[in-house]
Amino acid sequence: MARQVICWCFTLNNPLAPLSLHESMKYLVYQTEAGDNGTIHYQGYVEMKKRTSLVQMKKLLPGAHLEKRRGSQGEARAYAMKEDSRVEGPWEFGEFKEVLEDKLRSVMEDMKSTGKRPVEYIEDCCNTYDKSSATLREFRGELKKKQAIEEWQLQRQPWMDEVERLMETKDCRRIIWVYGPQGGEGKTSYAKHLVKTRDAFYSTGGKTADIAFAWDHQELVLFDFPRSFEEYVNYGVIEQLKNGIVQSGKYQSIVKYCNYVEVIVFANFIPRSGMFSEDRIVIVYA
């Protein structure tokens, strides 16, 4: 048992007097019950204003059997108010106010319903924040990603049908390059649509180690290059991913494999001459 806790459940056999809210207590609920053998007892739940030891609690509730609360606040309160063994009561004192449990699952569920940032739990759930702040940030990122993806809308363009027709047939060498020089053709919107509907991996380019580390074996890989990236396109990692074998040297060296990867590039420019063999590239004009 923890040496000092806030919330206690108690049983007091053969009580002689009613209980009242001590100044050190924040909330108290109890009722008179009859046990299986007919023993009359108080079954109760108490929340203290500060952490309290078992010795201190025994002074407040002489003769009571005390245990720290193991379930939720609501479960402990309900157990002290159950009807099946009730003789009299229940009696409540103080204000019952459910607070968030300092546990990772509870905090994650609260984040999902409230939209709070991890740092907002630093005071009320300090242990969880201290141990799992990175997990909470990652979880919030996934929530934000899901919310954003749900809002993405697509305005269909004819060239998109051509891309989907190409994807119907697997080709272990083909890289689909969607070329739209003017901008505004819907390239990025279509890339978002594929992320939303096909669990695609999306990248705007970068170093091989970073891209290989981020890629999680998705079978559809999308490169959506800004116009300013033309001189910095990493053609090597595009080809590695298409081959289904890519090496990541970020944090630790690892080789990732995938049986088949479809690669689609969206750009305002065509690939630089000589970077791919001619049979590699299928250009779709947006």
Swiss-Prot record:
ATP binds at residues 180-188. A motif (Nuclear localization signal) lies at residues 50-70, 96-102. It catalyses: ATP + H2O = ADP + phosphate + H(+). It comes from the Viruses. A motif (RCR-2) lies at residues 41-43. PROSITE patterns: CRESS_DNA_REP. A motif (RCR-1) lies at residues 9-12. Transmembrane segments: none annotated. Its cofactor is Mg(2+); Mn(2+). One of its GO terms (cellular component) is host cell nucleus. A motif (RCR-3) lies at residues 79-82. The genome of nanoviruses is composed of six to eight segments. In addition, some isolates contain subviral DNAs. Essential for the replication of all genomic viral ssDNA (trans-replication). The closed circular ssDNA genome is first converted to a superhelical dsDNA. Rep binds a specific hairpin at the genome origin of replication. Introduces an endonucleolytic nick within the conserved sequence 5'-A[GT]TATTAC-3' in the intergenic region of the genome, thereby initiating the rolling circle replication (RCR). Following cleavage, binds covalently to the 5'-phosphate of DNA as a tyrosyl ester. The cleavage gives rise to a free 3'-OH that serves as a primer for the cellular DNA polymerase. Belongs to the nanoviridea/circoviridae replication-associated protein family. This is Master replication protein. It comes from Subterranean clover stunt virus (strain F) (SCSV).
